Amino acid sequence: MKYDEIMVRYGELSTKGHNKKSFIDRLGSNVRKALHQYDQVKIHPNQDRLHVELNGTDAEPVMERLKQVFGIQNFSPSLRVEKDFDSVVEAAVAIFKEQVQGPTTFKVETKRADHKFPMGTFEMNKQLGGALLKAFPTDLSVDVHHPDITLRVEIRLNGIYLTSAKILGAGGLPVGTAGKGMMMLSGGIDSPVAAYLALKRGVSLEMVHFYSPPYTSEQALAKAKELTGKLAKYSGSIKFIQVPFTEIQETVKEKVPEGYLMTVQRRLMLRLACALAQKRAGLAVFNGESLGQVASQTMESMLAIEDVTTMPVLRPVLSYDKNEIIKIAEDIDTYDLSILPYEDCCTVFTPPSPKTKPNLKRARSYEARLDVEGLMQRALDGIEITEIHAGDEFLNQNQDVFAELL
């Protein structure tokens, strides 16, 4: 069926009071960004909902993109007809012909924004329902409480719109309404899921990835970039900041006792992420830590690591177990990429028995053996920033290079 418009309903935006307009404006901007390749599509954000005018564009690919825009509770493809009852009946019958396959219950719900239209909502419900029963005498029956099909009719100034579908959106808040944060992105399963959940709460993210050549490979770096491409479909594009970490890891290994390697290393990672946040107008640092999952994610470890900053360190998957995280990773299509066996810097130089309850004073004293300021400055001087868009691929490019070398 050739639809004329998609009616988008807001989620939590309806609770935002005086701030609602700024949330709606941001959602409108995000929808325009998501649909930028469809030149004929027009976006009209209003107080109660957002209207996507298709102007001949196929609704299916547009709806697939809308499913990935946070801040949308649900949406409905709709037909527009002229403001006369016969046209409404004709469109309603066409909609039902596609959906009625045997005995089916239905009801009609009408909203009238144009109060000059001669037919009231109750009369429209009654007359249109009767016309549909006449058109499908053996299959249709009315059920106003739990119908199989709800036909929604909106009488507006520019026409009458009909829809019977309600498609679930991504929920959450529009990306950009909750401020900006730095996401510490490894190549594992947890941090992409944490990034997804942060985006869903309206946070605009930049990815911070630590890489340690030659201990980590080009494939590991490419994997992290491609994971960012998977996440970019929810926010339009994401800046990927790669931070050279080899010198820091080698120095920590040389000067810090084995049991505290991981703690001091992660203190330096957090220092760098916070420095980037301060430099790039970020308000918080996000990571993929899940309480108790590994040695560095005990509360004692978190205390010893987070000691280096006063900036909020937020952990969206803190209370999730591994199976819950994996389920989300599968749903957002990052799982298969995350489990590719390319070692990242978080697993380089991992001691066999890291401290699960590191002592804060000892962590500070071991870190004091390092030229922290110099190490950080050299790492920050060596960063590279890439803007990554939805669907960008990096692993295949690297595989082609390796194939040529072979």
Swiss-Prot record:
Domain of life: Bacteria
Transcription as UniProt keyword: no
Cellular compartments per GO CC: cytosol
Boundaries of every THUMP domain copy: 60-166
Main location: cytoplasm
E.C. designation(s): 2.8.1.4
InterPro entries: Rossmann-like_a/b/a_fold, ThiI_AANH, ThiI_fer, ThiI_N, THUMP_dom, THUMP_ThiI, tRNA_STrfase, tRNA_sulfurtransferase_ThiI
Subcellular location: Cytoplasm
Keyword hit for RNA-binding: yes
Class of this enzyme: transferase
Metabolic or biological pathway, per its Swiss-Prot or TrEMBL entry: Cofactor biosynthesis; thiamine diphosphate biosynthesis
Gene Ontology BP terms: thiamine biosynthetic process; thiamine diphosphate biosynthetic process; thiazole biosynthetic process; tRNA 4-thiouridine biosynthesis
Cysteine disulfide links: none
Keywords: ATP-binding, Cytoplasm, Nucleotide-binding, RNA-binding, Thiamine biosynthesis, Transferase, tRNA-binding
Catalytic activity: [ThiI sulfur-carrier protein]-S-sulfanyl-L-cysteine + a uridine in tRNA + 2 reduced [2Fe-2S]-[ferredoxin] + ATP + H(+) = [ThiI sulfur-carrier protein]-L-cysteine + a 4-thiouridine in tRNA + 2 oxidized [2Fe-2S]-[ferredoxin] + AMP + diphosphate; [ThiS sulfur-carrier protein]-C-terminal Gly-Gly-AMP + S-sulfanyl-L-cysteinyl-[cysteine desulfurase] + AH2 = [ThiS sulfur-carrier protein]-C-terminal-Gly-aminoethanethioate + L-cysteinyl-[cysteine desulfurase] + A + AMP + 2 H(+)
Signal peptide positions (record): none
CDD domains cross-referenced by the UniProt entry: PPase_ThiI, THUMP_ThiI
Gene3D superfamilies: 3.30.2130.30, HUPs (3.40.50.620)
PROSITE patterns the UniProt entry points to: THUMP
Reported function: Catalyzes the ATP-dependent transfer of a sulfur to tRNA to produce 4-thiouridine in position 8 of tRNAs, which functions as a near-UV photosensor. Also catalyzes the transfer of sulfur to the sulfur carrier protein ThiS, forming ThiS-thiocarboxylate. This is a step in the synthesis of thiazole, in the thiamine biosynthesis pathway. The sulfur is donated as persulfide by IscS.
Similarity section: Belongs to the ThiI family.
Identification of the protein by name: Probable tRNA sulfurtransferase
Organism: Limosilactobacillus fermentum (strain NBRC 3956 / LMG 18251) (Lactobacillus fermentum)
Source taxonomy: Bacteria, Bacillati, Bacillota, Bacilli, Lactobacillales
